[in-house]
Amino acid sequence: MTTIPRKGSSHLPGSLHTCKLKLQEDRRQQEKSVIAQPIFVFEKGEQTFKRPAEDTLYEAAEPECNGFPTKRVRSSSFTFHITDSQSQGVRKNNVFMTSALVQSSVDIKSAEQGPVKHSKHVIRPAILQLPQARSCAKVRKTFGHKALESCKTKEKTNNKISEGNSYLLSENLSRARISVQLSTNQDFLGATSVGCQPNEDKCSFKSCSSNFVFGENMVERVLGTQKLTQPQLENDSYAKEKPFKSIPKFPVNFLSSRTDSIKNTSLIESAAAFSSQPSRKCLLEKIDVITGEETEHNVLKINCKLFIFNKTTQSWIERGRGTLRLNDTASTDCGTLQSRLIMRNQGSLRLILNSKLWAQMKIQRANHKNVRITATDLEDYSIKIFLIQASAQDTAYLYAAIHHRLVALQSFNKQRDVNQAESLSETAQQLNCESCDENEDDFIQVTKNGSDPSSWTHRQSVACS
């Protein structure tokens, strides 16, 4: 009997040797960090316009590594020769070659030739690996049952490592995509384990918060019928001891019905009933505000700033800002008006100016927005210089109103002085007339007595000598 050798049986010992080498490399990579270090290789390009003869050798070497069917690989018209010893097997700039085939050929060359020192560094793109299930299926087709068992042991070790480092891999998923095949497998397992956690948390949250409303049925947990009836009985006994005080009494049936109604109503219904009740408004007593200006008539009211002049520092000091009022008080017996200036500070309504207008009061318009006046200070009741700062229109109205009243006061004082002078002259004349009348009366009395006026004069002269 002749035995027909199975296809690919000649390559089985070599493939097992390469698989063992791959397992050793993977274990070394597991001991290292999860993310592989990038390797930088600098290339020198040489333009060639002909396909090199090495492509035929590469096509013949490909079925020996992974069992892929032989395909003719076309190189681009412009290729670059690479000086790296590891990349001698397959061209990196080959457009029609996948990254997986390039990597497998490089690994086989490195396994056969042993470790080779890098003469230069090459910048390589990210390696996109196939899923573990497909790779295992390909290994089963190419290498047989022994290779499949080694692949399963490799998956078990990957699962153990992924369980130990799941939290680290979940944080670095974006970086681990660039790593080697082991790290990609760990990322896949770590992502599945992490993805299951939010679902478990959601299920536990739903089970905990099943139809629970905060604050609902508080009466069942805090108040009971016995707790309500006992204080009520104590109140009844206290009412019997003091009959003069009226205390409302509720029967026990009323309290039980009330608690039953509270239990039956839900939180939403009780809130709606509470909001539907009329709100209790607190009525405050009205207080009459007395300012002392009730009997006065307001003539002018402006918003302004008040400054006072300090003689020691020769500067203006702001007293405050607020509302300035010019009020006319009741007229006197002579028919004149008494006016005063009142100003209160804005906000606190503190009195900062309260001065009457008098005839000797000085007023001067400094500019179109400022007016200087002399008024009495509330602190020491002395006459000081004040500056009123307001808008141009308000300043004009204030100056005109004060000036008009000062002119009226001055004219009234002049008229009063004239009247006083006239009254003094009249009283003097009356006194002179009375003295003349007295002398005439004395002369008439002497003549009536019958005495000679010549003898009266003689006697008078003798008396004088």
From Swiss-Prot:
GO annotation, cellular component aspect: cytoplasm; nucleus
CDD domains, sorted: RanBD_RanBP3
Superkingdom classification of source: Eukaryota
PROSITE patterns reported for this sequence: RANBD1
Molecular function GO labels: SMAD binding
InterPro entries for this protein: PH-like_dom_sf, Ran_bind_dom, RanBP1-like
Pfam families linked: Ran_BP1
Coiled coil regions, renumbered to chain: none
Record GO biological process: mesenchymal cell differentiation involved in bone development; negative regulation of osteoblast differentiation; positive regulation of myoblast differentiation; protein export from nucleus
Family annotation (SUPFAM superfamilies): PH domain-like (SSF50729)
Tagged with keyword Membrane: no
Record-annotated RanBD1 domain positions: 276-417
Subcellular location per the Swiss-Prot or TrEMBL entry: Nucleus; Cytoplasm
Keywords of this entry: Cytoplasm, Nucleus
Quaternary structure (record): Interacts with SMAD1, SMAD5 and SMAD8; the interaction (with SMAD at least) increases when SMAD1 is not phosphorylated and mediates SMAD1 nuclear export.
Functional summary from the UniProt entry: Nuclear export factor for BMP-specific SMAD1/5/8 that plays a critical role in terminating BMP signaling and regulating mesenchymal stem cell differentiation by blocking osteoblast differentiation to promote myogenic differention. Directly recognizes dephosphorylated SMAD1/5/8 and mediates their nuclear export in a Ran-dependent manner.
PANTHER family linked to this entry: RAN BINDING PROTEIN, RAN-BINDING PROTEIN 3-LIKE
Protein name: Ran-binding protein 3-like
Higher taxonomy: Eukaryota, Metazoa, Chordata, Craniata, Vertebrata
